[in-house]
């Protein structure tokens, strides 16, 4: 994912947490914040130490990034934060992508022309 598509600063995370809306399923929590003047989506990731050691946490982050990258063109330009829950450590890529697509649909993150 390119730098301009990442949320890194604590103030950006706090803004999304305070002003945004959240939706969750078993594996992930998704916080979204609409930014009217923004042209591209920005993603922040949070993977707790409860999920496993560094190898497992980094694998989960890679899977999430890849799933978002594949869906990027279909998503609205918003800020969102994905927080991985404990079951996310055991998911394959296909399961991760399916779980995230479910959250994207529930929060209406897909653009109107999408057939999702």
UniProtKB/Swiss-Prot annotation:
EC number of the protein: 3.1.26.5
Gene Ontology terms: cellular component: ribonuclease P complex
Molecular function per GO: 3'-tRNA processing endoribonuclease activity; ribonuclease P activity; tRNA binding
Catalytic activity: Endonucleolytic cleavage of RNA, removing 5'-extranucleotides from tRNA precursor
Pfam hit, one: Ribonuclease_P
Enzyme class: hydrolase
Biological-process GO terms, alphabetical: tRNA 5'-leader removal
Keyword RNA-binding in record: yes
InterPro entries listed in its UniProt record: Ribosomal_Su5_D2-typ_SF, Ribsml_uS5_D2-typ_fold_subgr, RNase_P, RNase_P_CS
Keywords linked to the UniProt accession: Endonuclease, Hydrolase, Nuclease, RNA-binding, tRNA processing
Similarity comment: Belongs to the RnpA family.
Job of this protein: RNaseP catalyzes the removal of the 5'-leader sequence from pre-tRNA to produce the mature 5'-terminus. It can also cleave other RNA substrates such as 4.5S RNA. The protein component plays an auxiliary but essential role in vivo by binding to the 5'-leader sequence and broadening the substrate specificity of the ribozyme.
Subunit structure: Consists of a catalytic RNA component (M1 or rnpB) and a protein subunit.
Protein name: Ribonuclease P protein component
Organism: Bacillus velezensis (strain DSM 23117 / BGSC 10A6 / LMG 26770 / FZB42)
């Amino acid at each position: 994912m390119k730098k301009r598509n990442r949320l890194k600063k604590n103030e950006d995370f706090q803004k999304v947490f305070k002003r945004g809306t959240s939706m969750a399923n078993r594996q992930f929590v998704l916080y979204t914040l609409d930014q009217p003047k923004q042209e591209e989506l920005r993603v922040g990731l949070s993977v707790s130490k409860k999920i496993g050691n560094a190898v497992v946490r980094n694998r989960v982050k890679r899977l999430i990034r890849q799933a978002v990258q594949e869906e990027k063109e279909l998503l609205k330009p918003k800020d969102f934060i994905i927080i991985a829950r404990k079951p996310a450590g055991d998911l394959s890529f296909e399961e991760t992508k399916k779980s995230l697509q479910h959250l994207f649909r529930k929060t209406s993150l897909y653009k109107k022309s999408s057939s999702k």
